Amino acid sequence: MAKTLKGLRASTFVDKTFATGSGYTIENKKKAIALPYNKALKKWVRLTLPSTGLSTVVQVLDVGPYLWWDEEFILKGKRPMAEWFYENDCAFPSVTDGHKRWGDISFAGKVPTSRASVDLTPPVWWDLGVDKTENELRSFSVDDMIMEWFVPEPIILEQEEDDEMPDWLKL
């Protein structure tokens, strides 16, 4: 059964390398979301942006922001760990605790700079109706994203190149 959480902070990422391989480039315009749990990789989520009323389904191709073990968020639907550290002005620990490898993150011992709990590539924002350039999106975020996870992979039907009605549909 899919989980839904409202009021997520979503920000933009344009990493050239994802945990799953090659990342986003201006040329490939790869659609992806990063979630803070490595076992979410290759799964699908539905995002809805209330301000535009649009939704899209996108694959998890990277981990983050900040963490890759936030199972309370992803598996149990609790608020993201990064939100708590940000809102309480609390630094991330810098000591490894089992699979929580605090010492391995670049923000170890620092307060997160944002409460972002998901990162999106620019084409995902465009699918959600955000009319900003790639450069403008680099500093763009919203606080009202709705995410439903995990959902079935979308079925994408190939479109006729000339957009004419196929013969088999004509009366």
Q: What label would you give each PLM region?
A:
Residues 1-169:
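Secreted/periplasmic proteins
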